[in-house]
Amino acid sequence: MGGRSSCEDPGCPRSEGRAPRMGCVKSRFLRDGSKASKTEPSANQKGPVYVPDPTSSSKLGPNNSNSMPPGFVEGSEDTIVVALYDYEAIHREDLSFQKGDQMVVLEEAGEWWKARSLATKKEGYIPSNYVARVNSLETEEWFFKGISRKDAERHLLAPGNMLGSFMIRDSETTKGSYSLSVRDFDPQHGDTVKHYKIRTLDSGGFYISPRSTFSSLQELVLHYKKGKDGLCQKLSVPCVSPKPQKPWEKDAWEIPRESLQMEKKLGAGQFGEVWMATYNKHTKVAVKTMKPGSMSVEAFLAEANLMKSLQHDKLVKLHAVVSQEPIFIVTEFMAKGSLLDFLKSEEGSKQPLPKLIDFSAQISEGMAFIEQRNYIHRDLRAANILVSASLVCKIADFGLARIIEDNEYTAREGAKFPIKWTAPEAINFGSFTIKSDVWSFGILLMEIVTYGRIPYPGMSNPEVIRALEHGYRMPRPDNCPEELYNIMIRCWKNRPEERPTFEYIQSVLDDFYTATESQYQQQP
C-alpha cells in the first residue's frame, strides 16, 4: 500500500458516507448501527453528564446479539481489519494504531468498534472509518467505495492530482460492477475526467475492452499502468485520498457547556452567534449559540433528534447539543464559512461559472436527500450553506426555522422573516413544503450566479410581494446561461406542483456541461 495524504479536512466529501450512515466512504460497507455506549449516566454520577445519542438503535454489550454479524468467528478473515491511517487515541478506552496494523474486531456498532491489536494484544475502541476488512478492495489505495460519478470528478480534479490519476469505484447503475475514472486533459475543455465501465466475465474476471481480460481488478490496474491500451491516459497514481474526519465521541449527544472552549466568533445572526470552538481539548467544531427565548428547549430537542438522523455528505453534520438555555448547537467545522460570505470574498469572487454550477449541484444533491426523506428546510439561502476548505458545500440549519418563537420571524410580515427567499404560498398562507424549498433554491441560484448579491436589488419586502403577485420575476444576469436561468424560472412557477423536484434539478446540474455527451467512454 502506498502513502495516503495526511490531509484531514472535515469538509472532504470522501470523509463521510452517504445517507443515512455516518463515517467516510470507507465505512459504508458497515451495517447500520449505533454508537457504542459503554456507560449510561446515572443520577448520582459526579462531574459533567453526557447523554448518549438518542438516535442510536442499539447498545454494545456482551449479551448484544446484534453486536457482530451472524456466523461471527473471532479471528476469521471476516473479523480482521487493517488500518488505512494512523490513529492516536484521544480517549482512555480507545486503541491507538499505525497504518497497516491488523486488528480483530470484537464488537461492532455504528462508528466505533471494539477491537484487539494482533501485534500488541491490547483492546480498545477504534474509529470504523479508519479501517477496512483485510484482503478487501477497500485496502487498495485506488478503490473508493460508494462514491458517485460526480464526486469522482470532484476528487480527481482537486489539487494534488495529476494527469492519469485514477480511481476504481462501485458502479452507480449496475450492482456488483465497477467503473474506472481517470484524469485527462484536452485542449478544448482543459482538465477533465473520463469514465470507463469495467465489465465482468462469467468466469469472474474483468475487462474494459474485450481485447484485454483480467482475473482481478489489481491485474487490470497493473496492465493500464504499463500503457494506456485504448484509455485516454496511462494510469499514473491513485487519486489523493484525504484522511477522514474522526467519528464523533461515543455517548456525547447532550454535552456539558464546560466541554466547549469558545475560541473565535465567526458571525452573528438574528437568533444568535456562530463560534469556532474546541470540544474537550481535541476536536475543532462550530457552535451556534441561540439567544434565550428564541425557541423552547423541548421543541428544539425534538427537532434536533430528527436533524441528527439526517446523515448525508452534503448536509452539515450535527454532533451534539447543550440543552440548557442558552442552547448550543455543535456541528462540524467548515473552514470557509457561509457560502454568502465566501462568494463575496476575494477567493469566492474569482470562482468561474463551472465552479458556481458545481456549488449549485452539490446543494441540490443535499436537498434531493431532504426531499427523499420527506423533510423540509424552510430557510434555504446562501447564508445557510457552509463551505469546507476543499470547497464542498453543505446545507446547514435545516428544520430550525420551524421552531423559532420570535414574533418578528414567525409573523410573516416581521422584519426578520426572509421574504425575498420565500415562496408566495408560504408568505400568504404559511404553507411550507418541499416545493416552497424549491422556490427558495431558485433564489439561491440567483445569489450564487451574482456572487452573493441581495435578491431583488433595490426593492423593499412589500414591493417584492406586490411584484410577485403581478407575475414579476428577477431578470437573467448577463453572466447566467439561459439553461441555468430556465431552472430558476421553473423553480418560481406560481403553482407549487409545477415546480421541479430536487432530484430532477440535481440531474440537470450534475450534467450541466455534458448533457449531450455519453458519460462513459466506448471501448472497441
Swiss-Prot record:
Against Pfam families, the record matches this protein to: PK_Tyr_Ser-Thr (PF07714), SH2 (PF00017), SH3_1 (PF00018)
Residues involved in ATP binding: 266-274, 288
Annotated active site residues, numbered on this chain, are: 379 (proton acceptor)
Purpose of the protein:
Non-receptor tyrosine-protein kinase found in hematopoietic cells that transmits signals from cell surface receptors and plays an important role in the regulation of innate immune responses, including neutrophil, monocyte, macrophage and mast cell functions, phagocytosis, cell survival and proliferation, cell adhesion and migration. Acts downstream of receptors that bind the Fc region of immunoglobulins, such as FCGR1A and FCGR2A, but also CSF3R, PLAUR, the receptors for IFNG, IL2, IL6 and IL8, and integrins, such as ITGB1 and ITGB2.
Domain (SH3) spans 76-136
Subunit structure, interactors included: Interacts with ADAM15. Interacts with FASLG. Interacts with ARRB1 and ARRB2. Interacts with FCGR1A; the interaction may be indirect. Interacts with IL6ST. Interacts (via SH3 domain) with ELMO1. Interacts (via SH3 domain) with TP73. Interacts with YAP1. Interacts with ABL1 and ITGB1, and thereby recruits ABL1 to activated ITGB1. Interacts (via SH2 domain) with FLT3 (tyrosine phosphorylated). Interacts with CBL. Interacts with VAV1, WAS and RAPGEF1. Interacts (via SH3 domain) with WDCP.
Could you tell me which residues are lipidated, with the kind given as N-myristoyl glycine?
A: 2
Q: What is this protein called?
A: Tyrosine-protein kinase HCK
Q: What compartments host this protein?
A: Cytoplasmic vesicle, Secretory vesicle; Cytoplasm, Cytosol
Would the keyword Lipoprotein turn up in this protein's UniProt record? yes
The entry assigns this protein to a family as follows:
Belongs to the protein kinase superfamily. Tyr protein kinase family. SRC subfamily.
Annotated stretches, region: Disordered: 1-72
